[in-house]
Amino acid sequence: MNLTFLGLCIACMGVSVGEGLLMNGLFKSVARQPDMLSEFRSLMFLGVAFIEGTFFVTLVFSFIIK
């Protein structure tokens, strides 16, 4: 197994952990301030977009290396 491929797998796991932490923060914030849901939702979509961008860059690198 190539160590580069292992590093890319670890990066993808980091993306999953990052999304989980983001959603955890969103749920806690909405539980405290339910009236701010629309503002939190827009910020959540922006955060998920950046996190998923990292995942897709990692996916492209894995295809290039393979």
From Swiss-Prot:
Pfam family, one: ATP-synt_C
KW DNA damage (keyword) present: no
Protein name, UniProt field: ATP synthase subunit c
InterPro entries the record matches: ATP_synth_F0_csu, ATP_synth_F0_csu_DDCD_BS, ATP_synth_F0_csu_sf, ATPase_proteolipid_c-like_dom, F/V-ATP_Csub_sf
Activity-regulation annotation: Inhibited by dicyclohexylcarbodiimide (DCDD); activity was higher at pH 5.7 than at pH 7.5.
HAMAP family per record: ATP_synth_c_bact (MF_01396)
Keywords: ATP synthesis, Cell membrane, CF(0), Hydrogen ion transport, Ion transport, Lipid-binding, Membrane, Transmembrane, Transmembrane helix, Transport
Topology of the protein relative to the lipid bilayer: Multi-pass membrane protein
UniProt-listed Gene3D superfamilies: F1F0 ATP synthase subunit C
NCBIfam families (alphabetical): PRK13467.1 (NF009997)
Subcellular location: Cell membrane
Annotated organism of origin: Streptococcus pneumoniae (strain ATCC BAA-255 / R6)
Main localization category: membrane
Residue intervals passing through the bilayer: 3-23, 45-65
Entry similarity comment: Belongs to the ATPase C chain family.
